[in-house]
A protein has these predicted regions:
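Catalytic strand-loop segment that frames the active site of acyl-thioester-processing enzymes
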Residues: 1-45
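HotDog/MaoC-like acyl-thioester-processing domains
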Residues: 2-11, 74-75, 85-143
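Generic structural detector for well-ordered beta-strands
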Residues: 12-16, 68, 116
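Short, well-ordered turn and helix-capping elements at secondary-structure junctions
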Residues: 17-19, 66-71, 103
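A broad, structural micro-motif
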Residues: 26, 60-62, 108
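Hydrophobic beta-strand-centered segment that forms part of the acyl-chain substrate-binding groove
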Residues: 42-93
Length: 143
């Protein structure tokens, strides 16, 4: 039986005044913060927090960020972001995102990010760090 294991987390949030532009729709730069909040929620849920990586001697900088806007979110809307880990053999963390308006359940944005691993000397890793191999194993993912 070869079931695909899906690691997902979600977080609900309110659209704040500081996140919108003069048209009162979410400013494009706010999506980077939403994605970051989702990664932190994922880290808490699946024990892959940034400080844990740091304690193992690694950094995971963002090298790719993409967002596709489908429908606008507006000031005072309530939204939900769903983050999904995309397993890869590469020494990367890849996440997909979906943002929904919780009142209408309309998909408002999708996106993805890619992070790589650096050691404490800021050298790029070409293979998975041992702690990520162990983390994948703990969560039933193939290396």
């Amino acid at each position: 039986m070869n079931e695909k294991i899906l690691l997902q987390a979600e977080k609900e949030f309110d659209i704040r005044f500081s996140e919108v532009d003069s048209m009162q729709i979410v400013w494009h730069g706010s999506y980077a913060l939403y994605f970051e909040d989702a990664r932190e929620e994922f880290g808490r849920k699946f024990h892959l927090e940034y400080m844990r990586m740091y304690e193992f001697g690694f950094y995971a900088p963002l090298v790719e960020f993409k967002v596709n806007y489908k429908q606008p979110l507006k000031y005072q809307d309530k939204a939900k972001i769903v983050i999904t880990f995309r397993n890869t053999e590469s020494a990367k963390l890849i996440f997909d995102y979906e943002i929904y308006n919780t009142k209408t359940n309309v998909l408002c944005a999708t996106g993805h990010t890619v992070q790589v691993f650096l050691d404490t000397n800021y050298q790029l890793l070409w293979t998975l760090p041992p702690f990520i191999r162990e983390w994948k194993k703990m969560n039933g993912l193939p290396e």
